[in-house]
Amino acid sequence: MSISKWPASERPREKLLSMGAPALSDAELLAIFLRIGCVGKSAVDVARELLQQFGGLRPLLEASQKEFCRGRGLGMVKYVQLQAVLEMARRHIHADMKVGDLLSSPHLVRDYLRAQLRHHAREVFAVLFLDNQNRLIAYEELFQGTIDGANVYPREVVKQALAHNAAAVIFAHNHPSGLAEPSQADIRITRRLQEALGLVDIRVLDHLVVGDGELVSLAERGWL
């Protein structure tokens, strides 16, 4: 049955307007994005099939262009639209991070770093450069490596921190394996970076390891 023939309270668009987006299921949200279904199936039916095919909403959102375009009802136009929406969401979070003290909004930092790093197929080491009020100056992905690791050079980190006139930094890197547990190498390089930056009076506030849906803080573990 076409969605237009459903009771108004059950139609995804009307439901969103009356109850808010959080009230919708993943399939209903995806159906709004798809806009139309196909012969014999509503957009919600197609959305449910896609979620089953990809294994959930997050794998669909993080799919490569080639993988995404294999989905029923999807294609290049939808892929471009989705990437634009995701980038707007990232920029919205980035703008929020420039307003206040990041230490008072740890969830914001974590959400931002997950969005930036978890989709990378190779290990990426990134730095948040902060001012003396812990507000974001810049986010930079400084080093990229293989699926097993990235070489990190303290001299380059110090150079970039000074260039941004940063008072503090937060490090982050992803584990493409999906496991966020820090390695001994992660702990060692963090301490080396802390020593190098300490020589120029720049504080290291944390080092976050991003896995598949989880994130570990070295500061919370007492390793800083």
Swiss-Prot record:
UniProt cross-references to Pfam families, sorted A to Z: RadC (PF04002), UPF0758_N (PF20582)
Motif JAMM motif: positions: 173-186
Residues that hold Zn(2+) according to the record: H173, H175, D186
PROSITE patterns from the UniProt entry: MPN (PS50249), UPF0758 (PS01302)
GO MF term list: metal ion binding; metallopeptidase activity
Matching Gene3D superfamilies: Cytidine Deaminase, domain 2
Record keywords: Hydrolase, Metal-binding, Metalloprotease, Protease, Zinc
InterPro entries noted in UniProt: MPN (IPR037518), RadC_JAB (IPR025657), RuvA_2-like (IPR010994), UPF0758 (IPR001405), UPF0758_CS (IPR020891), UPF0758_N (IPR046778)
Record-level GO BP terms: proteolysis
All copies of domain MPN, residue ranges: 102-224
NCBIfam families for this protein: PRK00024.1 (NF000642), radc (TIGR00608)
Similarity comment: family membership: Belongs to the UPF0758 family.
Name of this chain's protein: UPF0758 protein CJA_3522
